[in-house]
Amino acid sequence: MNTLLAVLMLAVAAQARPDAAGHVNIAEAVQQLNHTIVNAAHELHETLGLPTPDEALNLLTEQANAFKTKIAEVTTSLKQEAEKHQGSVAEQLNRFARNLNNSIHDAATSAQPADQLNSLQSALTNVGHQWQTSQPRPSVAQEAWAPVQSALQEAAEKTKEAAANLQNSIQSAVQKPAN
């Protein structure tokens, strides 16, 4: 901490210029140094090609919206499957859809793309297992589960791909050599 303070004091002293009367305005020198540091940080940020906080938030929001759209498609598919089968199968599909939607919502609200992917994969595994074990007639369950499983697999693959793309773009931006 003392070293940092000494460096800052040295920087202020180097930045300070006496006025016509020979006086040094330390506050003005500190303000100029702060301005220089802020400009250097912005230039470094631009040189590395890093997204601004707003851009990063927009990317994550875009990913979350795409994820929610896919979930809506899967939920619609689940409801269509539920309409094909009456009674207990329809009830189980509705419960399955609610559990899936809740699990995916939890995954989509995770802060990190890797966390989203892990939560989604866990949710898909858990909900798929619940569906398969709760069905009293395995042949009906497997028949109803096949299109749902396909849609879930597609959603998982697209989410994994989107998370990987986002992670790669962030890593390449961070690793981009300064010109």
Swiss-Prot record:
Question: Which Gene3D superfamilies does this UniProt record tie to the protein?
Answer: Apolipoprotein
Query: Where in the sequence is the signal peptide annotated?
Result: 1-16
Q: Where would one find coiled-coil regions in this protein?
A: none
Cellular component per GO?
extracellular region
Stretch list, region Disordered: 152-179
Name the keywords, alphabetized. Glycoprotein, Lipid transport, Repeat, Secreted, Signal, Transport
Instruction: Tell me the compartments it is located in.
Output: Secreted
Q: What is its main location?
A: secreted
Q: Which cysteines are joined by disulfide bonds?
A: none
| Source species, domain of life | Eukaryota
Query: At which residues are the sequence repeats?
Result: 30-40, 41-52, 53-60, 61-78, 79-89, 90-99, 100-113, 114-127, 128-140, 141-151, 152-165, 166-179
Record carries keyword Signal: yes
Q: Name one GO biological process term.
A: lipid transport
> Quaternary structure?
Equilibrium between a soluble monomer and a bound lipoprotein form. Apolipophorin-3 associates with lipophorin during lipid loading until each particle contains 14 molecules of apolipophorin-3 in L.migratoria (5 molecules of apolipophorin-3a and 9 of apolipophorin-3b).
| Function statement | Assists in the loading of diacylglycerol, generated from triacylglycerol stores in the fat body through the action of adipokinetic hormone, into lipophorin, the hemolymph lipoprotein. It increases the lipid carrying capacity of lipophorin by covering the expanding hydrophobic surface resulting from diacylglycerol uptake. It thus plays a critical role in the transport of lipids during flight in several species of insects.
The record's misc note reads: Two isoforms of apolipophorin-3 (a and b) have been found and occur in a ratio of 5a:9b in the hemolymph.
Protein name, as recorded: Apolipophorin-3b
Biological source species: Locusta migratoria (Migratory locust)
